[in-house]
Each structure stands twice: as structure tokens, then as C-alpha cells.
Amino acid sequence: MLENPAYAWDSQRDQYCCRRVLQRLERSCSPSSWRVLGVTEVDLFMPILKYVYGASQLAGRCAVISLHRLRPQYYGDKENEPLLWERAVKTALHELGHSVGLTHCRRRQCVMYSSWRIQDTDAKLADFCPTCRELFKWNLEKRL
């Protein structure tokens, strides 16, 4: 779990800039690290988006996910740890997919489908569709 990334705070948006978090992760990870996934509780954004559940460097080593908007309580629902972790796993797999070069998929149940709303995350499976799975394997073999 990442400590509070105060260095990424944007007072105009009352959120944390995802790019700054990724840059810090990249500088701090060991050259021998294959992939690094940061997990945080803070609300993240990208400059062109209101918020993000996670972000990664396309074909890069670092990714980050935020539990902030993955928590059911954020939407006025009661606490539900199994649902939170299901959402976190899907978001982490999605960002891992980006880190090996995958782009968004059009299949709603594929973990690489873009989540614009939490309902999109909930509708996905915690798995790649057959096409994305093959692309994942191919990209992974190419990078190892």
C-alpha cells in the first residue's frame, strides 16, 4: 500500500495526480523489477479525466490503482469487502494488461474493457477474453 502521496496533491481538483504517482513509482522501483503495482486509498485523476480507478504506463513497468472509488461506500452502499477486492483484482489485471501493451477491448466482459463507471467494472470478469489472453501471452513472451 502506498503511503499518502502528498507530492501528487492537486489543490484545484482536490484529488491526486496519477501521473505524478506513476513517475515516483518509476523512479523508486528496482531496475530488476518486472512490474510494480502501487495501491492507494486516495482519489486519483488524469488531467483529461475527472477520475481514474487505476493507470499504467502502456508497455511500461509501473501501474497504480486506487481503492477510493472501488469501495461500495463511495456510492452510498454498505461496506462489502469481497466486492471491493473483486473490483481491485479486476482493476489490477486491467492495468497489468496495459503494462504489457494491451489496449482497451470492446467485449464488455473482458477485463480490458474500459471502465467509465463502476458498473462497467462490476460487469467484467476477472479474466481476459480469448483474444486479449492470446495478445497478453504474445506480448509477455516478447518482453521476457
Where are each of the predicted segments found?
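Metzincin-family zinc-dependent endopeptidase catalytic domain
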Residues: M1-A92, T103
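The catalytic-center signature of Zn2+-dependent metalloproteases
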Residues: Y75-L144
